[in-house]
Amino acid sequence: MIAITLPDGSRREFPGPVTVAEVAQSIGAGLAKAALAGRVDGQMVDTSYTIDHDAKLAIITDKDADGVDVIRHSTAHLLAYAVKELYPDAQVTIGPVIENGFYYDFAYKRPFTPDDLVAIEKKMGELAKKDEKVTREVLSRDDAVKLFQGMGEKYKAEIIASIPEDQEIGLYREGNFVDLCRGPHVPSTGKLKVFKLMKVAGAYWRGDHNNEMLQRIYGTAWAKREDQDAYLHMLEEAEKRDHRKLGRELDLFHIDEYSPGTVFWHPKGWTLWQEIEQYMRRVYRENGYQEVKGPQILDKTLWEKTGHWDKYRENMFITESEKREYALKPMNCPGHILIYKQGIKSYRDLPLRFGEFGACHRNEPSGGLHGIMRVRGFTQDDGHIFCTEDMIQAEVTAFTTLLQKVYKDFGFTEILYKLSTRPDKRIGTEESWDRAEAALAEGLRASGCEFEYLPGEGAFYGPKIEYVLKDALGRQWQCGTIQVDPNLPERLDAEFVGEDGARHRPIMLHRAIVGSLERFIGILIEQYAGALPTWLSPVQVVVLSITDSHAEYAQSVAQSLQKQGFRAVVDLRNEKIGYKIREHSVQKVPYQVVVGDKERDENQVAVRARGNVDLGSMPLSAFVERLKNDLANKS
């Protein structure tokens, strides 16, 4: 007998080996029809998979996140099937699932056009309606290489040839199309009903710029039409909020071909940057951090000691001087340990919290650069806490509480907490991992946080927490982190004198709240669609004169606001007031103050808030109180 345990704890027994589909059928016809795949003892499998032992089984449908991934993976194969039907000379390469969709890379003699995408999507629909069965086959590596070589698919043959000789190769067949894949896939193409091709882009074979350029077709696929419609609407809204577009329109920054992946901040953008930096600097001061500053360039021998020279060198910018090799720092942590090591540290000095607005450089591939979100030169609100093992929990609690306040001040109230635990390849004892993971978990609980475990996702030297914020469009951004690290202090010989008089290694907690300031500013721009809260706006008030006769009063109003610390400018141009109001509205200035005869004569100001809200006339002192309230409330 084969005993199958279902997620609700119930058991079903079968006289012999049984497929996932048969188990689903035994539960009910509705579930059998909805089944897309199964999870047997934690492993994702096809519905045709035969279970020949007592096992735990979950039937996967389109209501499960894994089910949607199966739909997307299968739709990527459907895309390749359609391309081969329409363009037999095209060669297929790889087609993975990505966030909200999938892509597939093709080699073809000419670029695919928008009209081609329309034709391919139409063919995909036709193939899906045929409801062809999707079947799995297993071949030896050499037989699989011969199969794809015989089909003229040199890229697939190359991939398979790189797989160990003794490893079996899984293939999936639907109609006339066969592809290499681990699976699982939907049982038939008729399960694929909601999809759309999005765009074509270039991609190097195997991600190496020395290889030939392929064509990458991106698509999206969903369980329900309304889910796809909501996603497409979100994309439309995201396009309107694109920080690259708004950065140009609002004159905040630009990226120049003379320095790819680094940011040229314009006066308005740099004002925004400084406001965030000064805010975070106050956060440092008020929470026991000492601000430090390390050099940009460090000798390669330091990076050899940390292990980065061997594992990360290709992502570092290297330079040479007087026969010594140096690297622009890609992270700040080694420098903070060198500062820590200056002078003997006692257990009484711990926890010791360093913070730095550290400029880092990483040699990211040019194809991965994206506005100010993904750059080569960036600055982090980088902090490191040197402490003992029994201090970790309290530090995590304090840091998490602080992070929540900071995110709230910036307008982010929905935060996801993810605790990454020990990977298979790791250093340290099981007991030390137990203690570190427990300290992180208890630190989160003490902060009132519900969190998700990410098994095996920790670094080789210690567990970490990722703090993921959700923006106005529901997108997730991982900005904050706290990481337990006993390894780097060991490598760089950091010590403190314990209560027992002996020397001990400190634990190092790597932590960041906003992470890269460049990326965080990009997130803020998109969160607010450029209409930043008053406290962050580069220009908080613009004073507009109606005619030249009001210029002197307008200037006096602007100067009064400036002296009180507000970012105010004055527009004295001889233009129609409606034109000036529209122009500054496009620039998303929080407040426009209009002054004419009435305002000048009565010593008042006519105030318009962003969004064309007329607040009427008021004394300047009343408007100042409104501004102060905005700044105090971070609005």
From Swiss-Prot:
Question: Which cofactor does the UniProt annotation name?
Answer: Zn(2+)
Question: Per UniProt, what is one GO molecular function of this protein?
Answer: tRNA binding
GO CC aspect terms? cytosol
Q: Where is this region: Catalytic?
A: 242-533
Q: Which residues form the TGS domain?
A: 1-61
| Pfam families the UniProt entry points to | HGTP_anticodon, TGS, tRNA-synt_2b, tRNA_SAD
Q: Which UniProt keywords apply?
A: Aminoacyl-tRNA synthetase, ATP-binding, Cytoplasm, Ligase, Metal-binding, Nucleotide-binding, Protein biosynthesis, RNA-binding, tRNA-binding, Zinc
Membrane spanning stretches = none
Localisation per UniProt entry: Cytoplasm
How is the cofactor bound here?
Answer: Binds 1 zinc ion per subunit.
Query: What enzyme class is recorded for this protein?
Result: ligase
A Gene Ontology BP annotation from the UniProt entry: threonyl-tRNA aminoacylation
What are the EC numbers? Answer: 6.1.1.3
Which residues participate in Zn(2+) binding?
C333, H384, H510
Reaction equations catalysed: tRNA(Thr) + L-threonine + ATP = L-threonyl-tRNA(Thr) + AMP + diphosphate + H(+)
Subunit comment:
Homodimer.
Known role: Catalyzes the attachment of threonine to tRNA(Thr) in a two-step reaction: L-threonine is first activated by ATP to form Thr-AMP and then transferred to the acceptor end of tRNA(Thr). Also edits incorrectly charged L-seryl-tRNA(Thr).
Task: Report the sequence similarity comment from the record.
Answer: Belongs to the class-II aminoacyl-tRNA synthetase family.
Q: Fetch the PANTHER family from UniProt.
A: THREONINE--TRNA LIGASE, CHLOROPLASTIC_MITOCHONDRIAL 2, THREONINE-TRNA LIGASE
NCBIfam families recorded: thrS
- Name it: Threonine--tRNA ligase
Organism of this sequence? Ralstonia pickettii (strain 12J)
Encoded by which gene?
A: thrS
